[in-house]
């Protein structure tokens, strides 16, 4: 279940390294871990930031992969 989509960062906790993304298509919010962010240096996201990502089924529900800030 891997498809590319876009969304906005709902929230992201830099200290814990995770947060959630609200999908533009109205689907369920998607968990995002800092390891899924494709950027150099410190991997973090800002609330309200536009991102593209792939949705995968994780152990505890939907999770984001290959997250790219737009």
UniProtKB/Swiss-Prot annotation:
List the Gene3D superfamilies hit by this protein, alphabetically: 6.20.370.130, Nucleic acid-binding proteins
Tell me yes or no: is Transcription regulation among this UniProt entry's keywords. Answer: yes
Keyword terms: Activator, Cytoplasm, DNA-binding, Stress response, Transcription, Transcription regulation
- Describe what upregulates or represses it: By cold shock.
Could you tell me one molecular function GO term of this UniProt entry?
DNA binding
Residues forming the CSD domain are: 7-67
Which Pfam families does this entry report, sorted A to Z? CSD
The UniProt entry, under CDD domains, shows: CSP_CDS
Keyword Transcription carried by entry: yes
SUPFAM superfamilies attached here? Answer: Nucleic acid-binding proteins
Q: From the UniProt record, list the coiled-coil ranges.
A: none
Record's protein name: Cold shock-like protein CspG
Which species does the entry assign this protein to? Shewanella violacea (strain JCM 10179 / CIP 106290 / LMG 19151 / DSS12)
Name the gene that codes for it. cspG
